[in-house]
Amino acid sequence: MSGGVYGGDEVGALVFDIGSFSVRAGYAGEDCPKADFPTTVGLLAAEEGGGLELEGDKEKKGKIFHIDTNALHVPRDGAEVMSPLKNGMIEDWECFRAILDHTYSKHVKSEPNLHPVLMSEAPWNTRAKREKLTELMFEQYNIPAFFLCKTAVLTAFANGRSTGLVLDSGATHTTAIPVHDGYVLQQGIVKSPLAGDFISMQCRELFQEMAIDIIPPYMIAAKEPVREGAPPNWKKKEKLPQVSKSWHNYMCNEVIQDFQASVLQVSDSPYDEQVAAQMPTVHYEMPNGYNTDYGAERLRIPEGLFDPSNVKGLSGNTMLGVGHVVTTSIGMCDIDIRPGLYGSVIVTGGNTLLQGFTDRLNRELSQKTPPSMRLKLIASNSTMERKFSPWIGGSILASLGTFQQMWISKQEYEEGGKQCVERKCP
């Protein structure tokens, strides 16, 4: 075995899973991540010489990054919000480093050079970005060993499988990724932009139609309880800073995400006005005190995930619903391995936590599955496992005794350069 072998559980390895919505990080061998905070970062152009360092603020050459929920939620003059990722891949490296620094200092509370790092990556990550990341981790953070693993493979491991079709529906996209014997089959990846953010947009439009204002909590000084459907009675805070549009939008989105999780439900059969009208309504109160019941719209909004044709403003024919994403992906794989994929369709990602998501998916797939195949849907019942499955898979992998020879050690990196990531990390 080349380059220092670490002993099984005592590795103290760190696992990072950085998604478009949140950053999950913690020690391998534990059952849930130590850190779970938004990937979105507040950015302020710092004035010269001024500026006190606050909790969760990282200063970099004239820029102050506000990282983590608390720092991000403080309204500040002109602070923009940004994300280091684009399409699931790292785009803004300076911002990405600020997130790593924050994770090490505030959550892991340890020096980077003491811990090997296993990081998850998008299955379509490019070679240049993988090499740049490897270089960053060894050169800037001086870590002893490194490994990159595709999110879908980690998700499969977290569910005790090495072969299966991973359906990952997160914030920015829904993807079906076939995994065979621990390797991603690139030709079978199918992506669709219909995911959590798309649902948020639909909710926003619903509020516009119903003429409901979205007032984020940071603007509210006091509110009075009002009757259902009555106009809200609330006081605005005085002396609010001039916040940027992007930051205000981010705060509104948080209100919408809460609404999504509390109210929406996926209909178990294709959407039907009559059936939806009989569904029990759900009561929801906005932060400013406005409250009302939601009926058919609870089912109508998430329907777009499964049947894009009835969403107005979408060229419906080009988009694939969730069920189609799965069957298309399996259809692009070799015929001999299809039974293994139908036999374990693994559901993961925060967006799949919508009520009724898996039931509807099961129904759609059982209609589309060829009669010769056995369909099995694997969806953990625990919210934690569904949100964190790539992280949990990484935690399992990095603490396996047999994995210890897989690390790219510092020595190997120094001898072989950043190219070794292509060779060692499939």
From Swiss-Prot:
GO terms for cellular component: bBAF complex; brahma complex; chromatin; GBAF complex; kinetochore; nBAF complex; NuA4 histone acetyltransferase complex; nuclear matrix. Changing D77G: In IDDSSAD; uncertain significance. It comes from the Eukaryota. The keyword Translocase does not apply. It is linked to Developmental and epileptic encephalopathy 76: A form of epileptic encephalopathy, a heterogeneous group of severe early-onset epilepsies characterized by refractory seizures, neurodevelopmental impairment, and poor prognosis. Development is normal prior to seizure onset, after which cognitive and motor delays become apparent. DEE76 is an autosomal recessive form that may result in death in childhood. Intellectual developmental disorder with severe speech and ambulation defects: An autosomal dominant neurodevelopmental disorder with onset in infancy, and characterized by global developmental delay, intellectual disability, ambulation deficits, severe language impairment, and minor dysmorphic features including a wide mouth, diastema, and bulbous nose. Additional manifestations are spasticity, hypotonia and autistic features including stereotypies. Brain imaging show thin corpus callosum, generalized atrophy, and mild periventricular gliosis. One of its GO terms (biological process) is regulation of mitotic metaphase/anaphase transition. Component of the multiprotein chromatin-remodeling complexes SWI/SNF: SWI/SNF-A (BAF), SWI/SNF-B (PBAF) and related complexes. The canonical complex contains a catalytic subunit (either SMARCA4/BRG1/BAF190A or SMARCA2/BRM/BAF190B) and at least SMARCE1, ACTL6A/BAF53, SMARCC1/BAF155, SMARCC2/BAF170 and SMARCB1/SNF5/BAF47. Other subunits specific to each of the complexes may also be present permitting several possible combinations developmentally and tissue specific. Its main location: nucleus. This is Actin-like protein 6B. Involved in transcriptional activation and repression of select genes by chromatin remodeling (alteration of DNA-nucleosome topology). Component of SWI/SNF chromatin remodeling complexes that carry out key enzymatic activities, changing chromatin structure by altering DNA-histone contacts within a nucleosome in an ATP-dependent manner. Belongs to the neuron-specific chromatin remodeling complex (nBAF complex), as such plays a role in remodeling mononucleosomes in an ATP-dependent fashion, and is required for postmitotic neural development and dendritic outgrowth. The keyword Nucleotidyltransferase does not apply. One of its GO terms (molecular function) is chromatin binding. Keywords: Chromatin regulator, Disease variant, Epilepsy, Intellectual disability, Neurogenesis, Nucleus, Transcription, Transcription regulation. The gene is ACTL6B. Residues 39-82 are annotated as: Essential for mediating its function in dendritic development. Belongs to the actin family. SUPFAM superfamilies: Actin-like ATPase domain. It is found in: Nucleus. SMART domains: ACTIN.
